[in-house]
Amino acid sequence: MSSTLGTRRIWLHWVTAVAVAVSLLTLTNTASAQPFGAWLTLSGSPSTGHSAIPANVALNPTGAFTFEAWVSITNSGSGEDCRSIAGKNWQQAWWIGLCTVGGKPTLRSYLKGSTSARNGGQIEPGRWTHVAVVFNGTQRLHYINGELAGTFAETGPLTTSTSEMRVGSDVSWTPVPGGAIDEVRLWNVARTEAQLRANFNKEINAAQAGLVAVWPFNGNAADVIGPHDGATTGTGVGFLTFPVAVNCGTTTATSLCLRNRFAITARWRTDPAGTLTNAQAQVAGVPNAGSGLFQFFSPDNWEIMVKALDGCGLNNRYWIFSAATTNVYYRLEVLDVKTGTQKIYFNYPGPPAPAVTDTSALAVCP
């Protein structure tokens, strides 16, 4: 691995105006969506900030392995330039990170020390992305936003290390990404694609079979289901949430403003699974206060209808419904600007897009 040092542009296209340190008091009333509550924020190299978790044999799964996290990170586009998402000494055991491969921001993993590198899937720079690496006994699998992005033959057992685990760094590879990491989960079982998709948009705060630890980074580096608490250390590290606003303003060429509080955007892709999205969806037609349309390819070819419904009087939730006339991949992002709560929906390519009828979407009433 190699690193290019120097001044880094720290990202977060949606948070340029505000960088607010999070206190535990603030977090008490934060609703849950994607990402969840607050997140770990990193300034990128040459800063050194990260979360350190003391060594424990449980952090070295050997027979089966799943690592997953939400990330919104950047690295340098020149050279190979690898940055750590998390690791337990890449020279001896496992490491998950972002590397520039062929000019693309690529998910890389090591599961058996320094000779075990595998590249598969691309991580959108500065855009919240769910990444997962799975070992099921015979294969290593990379997932991006629930899509299988790489499959590699792998035999067990996985190797171990007595080094501490780090999030945002590694004891043998200290270059830090710029951006944010949230909801880090480590399992000693192989999670399936269906299990990843069913749970990456839900908080986990109770023990489950095979779940070793969960670090939600809601103002601290505690493990919320077990004893593997971490601690932030170094420079340029902290916790953030989305900034809040009185309203979402007006609908723009690329963003719907619904019910005066929900900023809704979409991105689409026709390239292979696990690669970067091709473009931003454009607002189509004439939206109203509660619903609107998006187009991908041309103004006379509408793709998605989305609406936000006030269900507060029924189940104390705002509802998000959508319908699409497409079979391409897209991601639909809904941000409640009043509370700084986001929900992301994915449509996977191939079959016609199913309708979304999410009556529990956002617990942000009134």
Stretches found by the model and what they are:
Residues 246-366:
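Polar/charged low-complexity regulatory segments
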